[in-house]
């Protein structure tokens, strides 16, 4: 399932954020995406400045100089991509938007498949919350899956900040989380079939 801690904060026990990202990508695509959105925000919080990123993000790792250079290069590459894609202040990298597209395609495929009754039930249970969230977003052009991911990410940020969360929001997040957990498992199943180790 999508763990609030793992999806919202880097785990200091791993040697590098890039390793965490790769592990999450293999294990749970939803956690990977939420993690990468947080990385984008951390890069923005450091003004996409290579020196600041090294001081605040890279320096916290107790690793060899070679590994530290690779971590710094990973952040630099992401910051460069953010600049070139024009998402310095907001928005998501194309590599991350592509994951949302893949998840949305799988979501639609599962809903069309009459044998996928579990996913359909999870979706229809979460649908009233999704509709409310879409209405609150001010008509932003988002797919249902992007709406769900954005809601979950917003919830994780609130938790990080220690902000209060209403019972209605908690229930919506619980329903959405169940649906996204199932979607992530299906994504992994399909990926394991098409890309066996």
Identify the meaning behind each predicted range.
Residues 11-13:
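Intrinsic-disorder-associated, low-complexity terminal segments enriched in Asp/Asn/His/Tyr and depleted
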Residues 19-90:
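N-terminal interaction modules that seed assembly of large macromolecular complexes
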Residues 20, 62, 70, 79-83, ...:
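A structural motif
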Residues 55-56, 97, 124, 170:
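Short, charged, amphipathic alpha-helical segments
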Residues 74-77, 102, 125, 129, ...:
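Charge-rich, solvent-exposed alpha-helical interaction surfaces
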Residues 93-153:
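A charged, amphipathic interaction segment
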Residues 131-197:
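Glycine-rich, aromatic-bearing surface loops/beta-hairpins
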């Amino acid at each position: 399932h999508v763990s609030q801690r793992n999806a919202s904060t880097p785990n200091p026990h791993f040697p590098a954020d890039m390793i965490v990202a790769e592990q999450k990508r293999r294990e749970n695509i939803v956690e990977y995406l939420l993690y990468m959105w947080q990385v984008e925000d951390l890069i923005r919080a450091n003004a996409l400045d290579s020196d600041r990123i090294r001081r605040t993000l890279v320096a916290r790792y107790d690793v060899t100089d070679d590994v530290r250079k690779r971590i710094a290069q990973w952040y630099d590459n992401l910051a460069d991509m953010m600049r070139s894609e024009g998402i310095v202040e907001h928005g998501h990298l194309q590599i991350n938007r592509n994951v949302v597209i893949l998840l949305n395609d799988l979501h639609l495929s599962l809903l069309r498949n009459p044998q996928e009754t579990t996913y359909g039930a999870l979706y229809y249970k979460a649908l009233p919350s999704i509709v409310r969230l879409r209405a609150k977003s001010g008509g932003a052009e988002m797919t249902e899956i992007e709406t769900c991911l954005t809601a979950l990410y917003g919830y994780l940020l609130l938790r990080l900040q220690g902000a209060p969360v209403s019972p209605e929001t908690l229930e919506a997040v619980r329903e959405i989380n169940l649906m996204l957990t199932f979607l992530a498992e299906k994504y992994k199943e399909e990926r394991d079939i098409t890309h066996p180790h």
